[in-house]
UniProtKB/Swiss-Prot annotation:
Part of the tripartite ATP-independent periplasmic (TRAP) transport system TeaABC involved in the uptake of ectoine and hydroxyectoine in response to osmotic upshock. Probably functions as a recovery system for synthesized ectoine that leaks out of the cell. The complex comprises the extracytoplasmic solute receptor protein TeaA, and the two transmembrane proteins TeaB and TeaC. InterPro entries: DctQ, TRAP_DctQ. It is found in: Cell inner membrane. Pfam families: DctQ. It is a multi-pass membrane protein. This is Ectoine TRAP transporter small permease protein TeaB.
């Protein structure tokens, strides 16, 4: 097991007090949701393939279940990516700055991104409520379609919280952090372009 996998398994937030507890709890919840989502999607897809080729019948609900799982994995995954500093960043100007400038810029970036995530959460809640009002249902599974989109505002909320925590971590630390647990820097395996 690599150091990165070991750190992932025993994640502990670098934030103080209740913020660290919340961050660690959200991290564990995200890991469970993502692992279960991927396993369920794989199981569902394999069962459908076996059913189609061995029995000549596809499972009627496979497409809808995989659609639900894709939405769940995507929006649980954005918070996970932010937590582990796995997001896309444009670093030409950022890398040219001294440590203090990088930390200040990371605080601004984190706060702005957090606000954008909360803004998107606000509008996605309205979208889910609109779907609820329309009363649409999934044809194969027969339950209301708004339920599968509840993951969208939850994902934006968790990601917004994570970026807010990153800003707090940078405000309370001497180092520059990409997330609450990832210090800025390049590993030996990464190359600068």
């Amino acid at each position: 097991m690599t150091d990165e996998e070991e750190a992932e398994k025993h994640y502990h937030s670098g934030l103080p007090g209740i913020l660290g507890t919340i961050d660690t709890l959200i991290s564990k919840l995200e890991a469970i949701i993502l692992a279960l989502g991927v396993l369920l999607m794989a199981t569902n897809t394999v069962a459908n393939v076996i059913g189609r080729f061995a029995l000549g019948e596809s499972l009627f609900f496979t497409g809808e279940v995989n659609r639900i799982l894709i939405i769940m994995i995507t929006f649980a995954g954005i918070g996970y990516a932010a937590r582990h500093g796995r997001h896309i960043r444009m670093s030409a100007i950022y890398d040219a700055l001294p440590v203090g400038g990088r930390r200040a810029l990371m605080i601004v970036i984190s706060l702005f991104t957090s606000l954008v995530m909360f803004f998107l959460m606000y509008y996605s809640v309205h979208y889910v409520l609109d779907l609820y009002d329309k009363g649409r249902i999934l044809p194969a599974l027969g339950f209301p379609i708004f339920i599968i989109y509840v993951w969208v505002p939850l994902g934006f909320l968790i990601t917004g919280i994570q970026y807010l925590f990153t800003a707090i971590k940078n405000l309370t630390s001497r180092d520059v952090y990409l997330s609450t647990s990832v210090v800025d820097g390049y590993k030996d395996t990464e190359t600068e372009v």
